């Protein structure tokens, strides 16, 4: 009998991922990555990742950071003008992908069923995933936040086997608190992260699987609130937006563990 590995907050992977979105040009991307690499603590247990525009993945792949792709189309190849496949992204150096980001859901109408296709495509190509979930203000105000997020996970992610989940990290985005002037409290962040972990445990009938998955906070995480957020039992890092475009801020967040 193989003894199961016991996961805790201490042993779960700690991740700080920078989503650059549609920002920077080539020279700026290289300058930023070099600055992050120089400031990075060599003794840190925190894994740093950046998700640049796809154009720049190849020029950044030799960095000390893990470089990921913000988006892809769930097909091998074909008549999908303007899109990129997993194989194309792997070929230029991407080693992880974002799936389900709130901007993809809202601006590009990516549904739970379409996101399931993306999850399946990534898994089929052995590509690790950061899967984003989160609720808008109307859902939170109605008291249905956890139910809504659990449905996102159920319809797009929870069909995976426990073995396939090994390559999945979850990022919670409180959409209602991003760019709205409303700030999510540390208590609200922890409550949702705990709720997500409980949903994993309930679906897979395993506290061990639930305890093994890193859950990142994708709200407005910055150097001033990072330490308080990362002290929460169920917050294992951050998916960082604006602060990821500044090397000093990005490293300050990483050093907040």
Regions found by a protein language model. Give the residues of each.
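Active-site loop-to-helix "anion-binding N-cap" substructures in soluble metabolic enzymes
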Residues: 5-171, 175-257
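Short hydrophobic transmembrane-like helices used for membrane targeting/insertion
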Residues: 1-2
């Amino acid at each position: 009998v193989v003894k199961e590995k016991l996961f805790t907050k201490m042993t779960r992977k700690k991740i700080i991922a920078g989503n650059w979105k549609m920002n920077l040009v080539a020279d700026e991307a290289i300058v930023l990555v070099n600055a992050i690499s120089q400031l990075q603590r060599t003794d840190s247990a925190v894994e740093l990742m950046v998700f640049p525009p796809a154009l720049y993945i190849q020029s950044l792949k030799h960095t000390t950071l893990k470089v990921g792709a913000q988006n892809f189309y769930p097909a091998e190849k074909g008549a999908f003008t303007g899109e990129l496949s997993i194989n194309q992204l792997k070929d230029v150096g991407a080693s992880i992908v974002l799936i389900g980001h709130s901007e993809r859901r809202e601006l590009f109408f990516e549904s739970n069923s379409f996101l399931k296709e993306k999850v399946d495509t990534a898994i089929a190509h052995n590509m690790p995933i950061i899967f984003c979930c989160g609720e808008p203000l109307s859902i939170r105000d109605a008291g249905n936040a956890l139910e809504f997020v659990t449905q996102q996970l159920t319809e797009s992610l929870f069909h995976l086997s426990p073995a396939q989940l090994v390559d999945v990290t979850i990022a919670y985005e409180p959409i209602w608190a991003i760019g709205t002037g409303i700030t999510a409290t540390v208590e609200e962040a922890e409550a949702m992260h705990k709720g997500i972990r409980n949903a994993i445990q309930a679906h897979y009938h395993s506290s061990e699987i639930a305890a093994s998955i890193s859950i990142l906070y994708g709200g407005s995480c910055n150097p001033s609130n990072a330490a308080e957020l990362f002290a929460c039992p169920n917050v294992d890092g951050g998916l960082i937006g604006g602060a990821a475009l500044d090397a000093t801020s990005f490293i300050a967040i990483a050093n907040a563990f």
